[in-house]
């Protein structure tokens, strides 16, 4: 695939959701699973927040870069809650992923993880510039939702 797509091995279905989005297929490789660089300030913020906590948390008040603008950046930093639905995946992830901090690791979600939230199968890969993949994923209609809408429309055709 060249230098634009990261390829990782994958051992199979970890849960029912992965089985569903992959149509019960075992997919040996995943694509676009590379985390973004995290600078020192964001590393500390990511480390200090617990799942479900955001930029308004007192633990990060002294290092929060947007503390004087919390009224407009209150959702700037958010650590996802494990085993709960994700926040909405948006094209803004192209700019930064602070609104989707991984619940266990000190990093933001990868394009592959964002694509999984949008129900893209693991063998779907995004070509092109790394940050563009976040925009493509954020602008997409979730695959499973599109399938359900198509099923209903088909009944009336």
Predicted regions and their residues:
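C-terminal target-recognition/interaction regions appended to catalytic cores
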Residues: 1-157
């Amino acid at each position: 695939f060249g230098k634009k797509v990261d390829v990782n091995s994958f051992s199979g279905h970890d849960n029912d959701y992965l089985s569903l989005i992959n149509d019960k297929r075992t997919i040996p490789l995943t694509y676009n699973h590379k985390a973004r660089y995290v600078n020192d300030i964001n590393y500390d913020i990511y480390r200090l927040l617990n799942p479900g906590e955001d930029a308004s948390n007192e633990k990060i008040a002294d290092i929060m870069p947007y503390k004087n603008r919390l009224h407009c950046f209150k959702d700037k930093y958010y650590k996802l809650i494990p085993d709960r639905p994700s926040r909405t995946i948006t094209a803004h992830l192209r700019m930064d992923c602070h609104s989707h901090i991984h619940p266990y690791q000190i990093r933001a979600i990868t394009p592959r993880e964002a694509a999984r939230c949008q129900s893209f199968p693991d063998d779907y890969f995004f070509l092109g510039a790394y940050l563009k993949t976040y925009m493509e994923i954020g602008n997409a209609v979730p695959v499973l939702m599109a399938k359900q809408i198509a099923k209903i429309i088909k009944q009336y055709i």
